[in-house]
């Protein structure tokens, strides 16, 4: 069929998958089956005080948060296209062609077809069913946003199948499953194809035309094409020539022909460029190919300033059109095929997250190896300039958050103001924007009161959010992009008198945060191995939280950065933490329809001195850089040990030393800061 990629036969690759039974939950009842698609509306997105991002497009949203969208007509149109292509199942991933977690509106296909707007999840549509699989961060949100056309697959729960298992079951009897090959990794695609055939299905086919795009039609937002700017050496700390030299050493070690980059943050980091094509993430649509002899950046050249072009030329980087990547990849495959007649060819490397389409264009398994990206590994270990930038921007950001919390308490308690969750988020952004090197937010602020705080990735929308209740928990998870670093901080507060239950929950979460922050571990330890430190106090009471404990953070890059993290994902088992990593430490506790608690700091991994050095290994620990006090009225001191009180006193002393000077002419904030940092 002309719609199907002509694919060579592939050898299936192994892929870790959690085992699960094949039970499928019943479709839940719709909250509002007649809700129409919310109209496109302007949202907060990257802003700049200088002219760095002056050409940034306005971010639009596809659905109002927590509103159910009627997907009946969309599903009918999609199924009609599926029948034309002899497909029984069609998979709609969350990601774009660069495996981005956060995506541009034009790539929000899963949101469009399902109505679910969380950042993680996969939609699977058959000719008579539809399922949405997502993880524990989004169970609450998905249950509110999905209409009655959809099953909710709660990934990781007992007796709930993975989306792959559900799709495979639906393909039994020789049926075909289709997917856009640019939106799925080759590892997942090849394993899924093998599983489908083993279960009696017809297999997985790559459909070149994205069927959701065809349903979306003229209403699909245009692809952003914003300007790109050069990040100076005073912020990057290392020039592109040096980074390319390091990458080429890795290619030589692996005896590779080259590395084809598809991850947007890796490309931005490698070439010391930043953009704004994806809201809150200073990246731009691009690809790159690096060999021992050349480096090519695939990008719309009109996006580059003269300064960027001069810099790239000086670093011997060739510029080619964004759309030429696949054609050039196919040419590389043809050359490799010709060369292989005389000698064993050197393979090209792609990221293990690279798309199925990219691997096929490069010639498949014969000419491609999928690896954990050497650029991603290098990016995750910050240099001294980047680390100092992270320290400095967190002082400024801490001052902004302190000013905001003091203002908010005064407004709610003393002024009796009626402020909704968006009012608060906007005020925080306004305060942040006054600080040096502020560029914009690093993600949409989670400003949540009461029961909304239990929605882990809640996003307030004007006209559909709550008035902040001073007598309920208030959770604020927010971050900013500065030229010298990226921030991500969560604080949970109560502006009235918290209940004993709320205080106990908060204190257990705080104890977990302190324990993980204080841990010392040998080099080679993974984030998986230390995750228990944050959960242990909740576990003693039979409590837990359904999200990871920590994620990597970029340096004026994506707020979620791999490959490192702290949690139970397989990659967190495989990837050891290293000095120079920057991660979040963010345990939490949530009661649906009641309240939510999360306490998040960012921390630098660094070498620490120990009395001994077993196995001649260096030992590592954390230096937390977040400079925001904890909520004193939510702390049950009777649950704290003397060591934990000492930790809090040291932390508060440092916060006071670093931020008090910002408030010499601000008596309200100064008084709030002094009160919240009093010794225990």
From Swiss-Prot:
Mn(2+) 2 binds at residues 477, 488, 600. InterPro entries: Creatin/AminoP/Spt16_N (IPR029149), Creatinase/aminopeptidase-like (IPR036005), Creatinase_N (IPR000587), Pept_M24 (IPR000994), Pept_M24B (IPR033740), Peptidase_M24_C (IPR032416), Peptidase_M24B_aminopep-P_CS (IPR001131), X-Pro_aminopeptidase_P (IPR050422). Keywords: Aminopeptidase, Hydrolase, Manganese, Metal-binding, Metalloprotease, Protease. One of its GO terms (biological process) is proteolysis. Mn(2+) 1 binds at residues 488, 586, 600. GO terms for cellular component: cytoplasm. CDD domains: APP. The keyword Membrane does not apply. It is an enzyme of class 3 (hydrolase). It catalyses: Release of any N-terminal amino acid, including proline, that is linked to proline, even from a dipeptide or tripeptide. Its EC number is 3.4.11.9. One of its GO terms (molecular function) is metal ion binding. Binds 2 manganese ions per subunit. The keyword Hydrolase applies. Its cofactor is Mn(2+). Belongs to the peptidase M24B family. Catalyzes the removal of a penultimate prolyl residue from the N-termini of peptides. This is Probable Xaa-Pro aminopeptidase P. The gene is AMPP.
